[in-house]
């Protein structure tokens, strides 16, 4: 099913004003079609903050479209964040791998490293668009995007920010 979706970085819309095809106003109009009554915070983020966060390089939002009818089926937002991990239970091999891309705190077995964060991830529930993609497929689109970024820029860690309440809701909405 992943070949049935197209993932677009919203920077493509913002940069397109130069050739007159799209632009920020067209992007805002497109985002207004997104609906998620199950999680008002992710809907509000997309409509009110995603563009500014992208302009400020705090994060980048990607829109996911169904390839057959070009309907907006979901979105995800990626950011790079520092994380601190305790390596007390890691094998020596894993510790060596993490040490290559992180800083170890003196006299502690904790490492601080940059990681890709899937900060937002949601399906569009307007007009049944949510039935055109599963949560697993949307997550896979985000992971595939991160893997491309890792190939181009490096890095080895990514994580998903999720609340338990929202996770349970997604499990019932497959």
List where the protein language model places each region:
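Conserved beta-hairpin
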Residues: 59-74
